C-alpha cells in the first residue's frame, strides 16, 4: 500500500500486549469501550510517519509499568487517551510533534516530553488535560518554532515538577489549574 494512502483503524475494546510500530502513512487509530473494557495498549506504540504524514489517536488507554507509551516520529494528535505507569508516557522525537487534548496522564516518570529539533507539523494547544502524580508532567528538552504551548483548562496536580522547560519555549499556563 502506498505511503500516501491513509489508514483508519477502529479497534475493539481489547488489550493489545507488546510493542507495535505504525509505519509511514496517515493514521487514524480510534479506540472503543464495551462496559468496563477499553482499547488498551500495554507496550510501546511507535509512529513512524515521514514527509508530512501524521497520526490521530483517540479513545485509547496506554497502561505500562516502564518504557515509553507513545514514541512519535511524526505529528501525533492524541485525544481522550489515558497514560498510566510509563517512564515516558508520550515523546516527540526528532521530526515529530505530539499534541494532547482531553487526555489523562497519571503516575508516569515523565508524562509528555519534547526532544525534537524540527517538526513536519505543529499543534500547540494542550487543552483540558489532567496531569496527576507524575515525576515531571511536561518536559521540553528541545522544540522548534515559536508557537506558544497553551495549556488552557489543563490541571496539574501532585506532580514533582509541573513543567520542566529546558528549551525555554513559550508556554501559556494562565488558564491552567495548579493544585
Where are these regions (language model features)?
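Acidic Gly/Asp/Thr-rich repetitive segments characteristic of extracellular carbohydrate-active
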Residues: 1-10
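Right-handed parallel beta-helix/beta-spiral solenoid domain characteristic of secreted/periplasmic
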Residues: 17-19, 26-71, 79-83
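Glycine-rich beta-solenoid repeat tracts in large extracellular/virion proteins
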Residues: 19-22, 40-51, 68-75, 88-96, ...
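All-beta strand scaffolds that present successive hydrophobic residues in beta-strands
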Residues: 28-31, 54-59, 76-80, 97-101, ...
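A charged, solvent-exposed segment within the mature domains of Sec-exported extracytoplasmic proteins
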Residues: 81-86, 90-97, 102-105
Amino acid at each position: 500500500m502506498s505511503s500516501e494512502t491513509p489508514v483508519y483503524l477502529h479497534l475493539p475494546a481489547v488489550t493489545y500486549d507488546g510493542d507495535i510500530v505504525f509505519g509511514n502513512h496517515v493514521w487514524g487509530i480510534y479506540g472503543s469501550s464495551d462496559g468496563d473494557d477499553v482499547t488498551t495498549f500495554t507496550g510501546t506504540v511507535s509512529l513512524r510517519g515521514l514527509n508530512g504524514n501524521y497520526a490521530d489517536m483517540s479513545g485509547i488507554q496506554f497502561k505500562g509499568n516502564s518504557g515509553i507509551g507513545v514514541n512519535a516520529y511524526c505529528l501525533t494528535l492524541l485525544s481522550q487517551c489515558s497514560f498510566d505507569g510509563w517512564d515516558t508516557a508520550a515523546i516527540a522525537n526528532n521530526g515529530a510533534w505530539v499534541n494532547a487534548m482531553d487526555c489523562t496522564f497519571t503516575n508516569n516518570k515523565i508524562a509528555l516530553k519534547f526532544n525534537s529539533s524540527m517538526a513536519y507539523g505543529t499543534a500547540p494547544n494542550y487543552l483540558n488535560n489532567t496531569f496527576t502524580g507524575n515525576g515531571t508532567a511536561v518536559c521540553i528538552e528541545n522544540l522548534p518554532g515559536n508557537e506558544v504551548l497553551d495549556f488552557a483548562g489543563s490541571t496539574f496536580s501532585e506532580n514533582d515538577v509541573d513543567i520542566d522547560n529546558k528549551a525555554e519555549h513559550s508556554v501559556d499556563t494562565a488558564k491552567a489549574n495548579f493544585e
